[in-house]
Amino acid sequence: LKSLLVYLKGYVKESICAPLFKLLEASFELIVPLVIAAIIDKGIANGNTSYILSRCGILVLLAIVGMVAAITAQYFAAKAATGFGRGLRSALYQKIQSLSFNELDNLGTSSLITRMTNDTNTVQNGVNLVLRLLLRSPFIVFGAMIMAFFIDAKCALIFLAAIVLLSIVIFLIMAYTTPGYKKVQSNLDSVTLITRENYEGARVIRAFTDESNEIAEFNRRNRALSNMQKKVGKISSLLNPITYVIINIAIVVLVYSGGVKVNIGDLTQGQVVALYNYMSQILVELIKLANLLVTITKALACADRIKSVFEQESTLDHNDNKANSNSYIEFENVSLKYRNAGDMSLTDINFTVNKGDVIGVIGGTGSGKSSLVSLVPHFYDASNGTVYVNGCDVKSLDDDKLRNKIGFVQQKSVLFKGTVRDNMKWGKKNASDNDIIEALKLAQVYDTIQEKGGLDFFIAQGGANLSGGQKQRLSVARALVRKPEILILDDSSSALDFATEARMRDAIYSLDYNPTVFIVSQRASSVMSADKIIVLDDGKCVGIGTHKELLNSCEVYKEIYVSQFGKEEA
């Protein structure tokens, strides 16, 4: 938690004022038992009504001043905690944005969402309570004990014994609950993951009538979360009753000892009442402190999870490699292995691309097509070898500048909630309506959008109100808006009919700014007219050439072509 407190830096005044005003309130609270003792011993005992009324006035004044101090403390604590939460969330979001695909894959989307929402809220609540109670509760506990020593040292030893016993209990409970809360958060990640997957894949689940299995799996994970929460909760719940038992036993001993001392004249009735009130104050504050420690335990567990994200360093390598390539794009002995993967996804890939070339990438499922094109914008580091873009090692280039030259359309079409215009401006922030319309026409989706309401048509979350083909074409249009130097279409026309795909492909080939195009597909028809076709099989390059050359020289390509067009065509 200490490493995250840097986000309180802008709230130093509030972080100091909140506990100070709480200490002021606590000071007034410690005076109250002495005033009550005086009322009993001097006012009631002597029948002095004016004395009683004056002391009651002091009690009212103490209550009002204490209330004002408490409200002020709450204001400062809330301001500091909410500011801390905002800063923490913002920094965490920026950190996540800076991570490479490797780290994002490793951490998992659901876990990151939980850390951004649930964990940050828990830490924020912990900071709020710490500012209000961490000094106040111990101050009253030890203050009440000191006041008790001033009244009667022997009776005050009862206070000391109770506090020592409770400290031992709190330590033992925290030793168990701290790791327990970490397991709770881990189980919450698991529940969030399956919930997210089920909502996103609801249509697939229903298509395979697999609802009962998914419900059973959700219930299993939910039960694991619930059981862990119960397990930790049972231990945490012991804190309050044990505190009550210890304090109430201490009160019984105190009242008995006080009564004996009153009989022999060592204490007055008012002093016994004052001791009782101090013991009651200790009880209340220890209950608050116990709950605070439970909250702190949760906050520490969540803070560790957040801290682990901040400690993640991007594994993308950057260097000053001055080696150049004579080709616009070149893969030189490139291999790729994903983190925690058993096998290589790509092995010893070599090819060159000239500026303005159209490159087809074809192969079966899992052959490494997407892995290959993801190395061009430096989404991942090659495990071996070098990838050159514009003649330079991608590791020596600024990632943002490199990616601003690339239009990348991924396999899964991702659209954001908002208008068509808003989505298109992801490709180019200052794109005019004419730029957007031109891109929509190139992607063969302009007429469809016009029928739906034009550029102001509102796209639902995840593009739920669009078909798969419409989402794919809008994704292509978004990439075309920026007029990229390199256009990568990663199986981005799989949901299109052949005629629409052919029209879109012809439009891209005829672009006046002549981009270098990578077309990834399992369809031979999508890559037949490319200047160069790269054939992948199990992560290895088994053929490079034109369509005609590969039909004669590459058995894998020929098999793909024959399976789609028939033997006579080949």
Model regions and ranges:
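An intracellular "coupling" helix at the cytosolic face of ABC transporter transmembrane type-1 domains
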Residues: 10-13, 98-102, 118-131, 135, ...
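Pre-NBD coupling/linker segments of ABC/ABC-like ATPases
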Residues: 313-324
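Helix-loop junctions and hydrophobic alpha-helical segments within the transmembrane domains
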Residues: 92, 96, 205, 226, ...
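ABC-type nucleotide-binding domain
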Residues: 325-570
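Transmembrane helices of ABC transporter permease
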Residues: 10, 14-27, 59-62, 68, ...
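Membrane-integrated ABC transporters
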Residues: 1-32, 36, 44-60, 65, ...
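Helix-loop-helix
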Residues: 47-54, 147-161, 231-304, 309-310
